[in-house]
Amino acid sequence: PSLAKQLPLLKAYQDKAVIFCADGALSMLEKKGIVPDYVTNLDFTDLAMKFFQNKENLKQSIIALECATHPNIVRSLNAENCMIVLRNKALYQRFNLNDFGYIDTGTHVSHFSYTLA
């Protein structure tokens, strides 16, 4: 409900701010012509594929997928504007991909968006 109230303000300032969007809110922004700079997802099931139906609008956004995102979601998206983010956990740090870094993605997409910002 609070997002719906803020959509006109977000639309007015979309070119003056970086917009992070949880995948579940993507359709709401699309309906108002708001293009997020980043779209985040950390779903381990493929139920979230429904949020990524409008591939044309996604071309202008960077899609940040948490390393546990379901493979079907990863495959369905354009690799050019996607990035896989590793959790800040010992299991993932063992991959020794330190040049890429690690993020505390948390357990929900709003935490992931906040940490990424």
Residue ranges of predicted features:
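N-terminal glycine-/serine-/threonine-rich phosphate-binding loop
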Residues: 1-19, 26, 36
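Short alpha-helix boundary/capping motifs
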Residues: 19-20, 107
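Acidic/Gly/His-enriched mid-domain segments of enzyme catalytic cores or analogous surface patches
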Residues: 27-116
